[in-house]
């Protein structure tokens, strides 16, 4: 079986969040760096740091929690398109998550971007995941 790096990112963040961990370490690839950059820009994580150990690159993510520490800041991360079932959308049919409050991450011909950027540029692509 092949590895799904995007599902791995989502699962690592979700598990660390449920376990109330402050940091999570994931393998660094071009795809993971682009997705983490979008998640950071949207404010779902606090900080990203590159780390090298035994000739392997990792990203160390600092998760964002509520100030009172009773709950997590991020609510839901969901993988949409996967290796067995690819989901594509043109720019007019990109779904709006939580009335525009959530984020859809797409893989387009111009790189990985959010739903807002794809609509602005008028391009569609593969829907990778939802964050809301």
UniProtKB/Swiss-Prot annotation:
It is found in: Plastid, Chloroplast. PROSITE patterns: RIBOSOMAL_S8 (PS00053). Keywords: Chloroplast, Plastid, Ribonucleoprotein, Ribosomal protein, RNA-binding, rRNA-binding. Its main location: plastid. Disulfide bonds: none annotated. SUPFAM superfamilies: Ribosomal protein S8. InterPro entries: Ribosomal_uS8, Ribosomal_uS8_CS, Ribosomal_uS8_sf. One of its GO terms (molecular function) is structural constituent of ribosome. The keyword Ribonucleoprotein applies. GO terms for biological process: translation. Gene3D superfamilies: 3.30.1370.30, 3.30.1490.10. GO terms for cellular component: chloroplast; ribonucleoprotein complex; ribosome. PANTHER family: 40S RIBOSOMAL PROTEIN S15A. Belongs to the universal ribosomal protein uS8 family. Part of the 30S ribosomal subunit. One of the primary rRNA binding proteins, it binds directly to 16S rRNA central domain where it helps coordinate assembly of the platform of the 30S subunit. This is Small ribosomal subunit protein uS8c. It comes from Amborella trichopoda. The gene is rps8.
């Amino acid at each position: 079986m092949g590895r799904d790096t995007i599902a791995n990112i989502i699962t690592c963040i979700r598990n660390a969040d449920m376990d109330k961990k402050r940091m999570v370490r994931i393998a660094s690839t071009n795809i993971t760096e682009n997705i983490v950059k979008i998640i950071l820009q949207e404010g779902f994580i606090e900080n990203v740091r590159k780390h090298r150990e035994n000739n392997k690159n990792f990203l160390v993510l600092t998760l964002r929690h509520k100030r009172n520490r009773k709950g997590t800041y991020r609510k839901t991360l969901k993988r949409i398109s996967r290796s067995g079932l690819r989901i594509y959308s043109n720019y007019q049919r990109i779904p709006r998550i939580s009335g525009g409050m959530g984020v859809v991450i797409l893989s387009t011909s111009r790189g990985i971007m959010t739903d807002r950027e794809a609509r602005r540029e008028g391009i569609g692509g593969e829907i990778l995941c939802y964050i809301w």
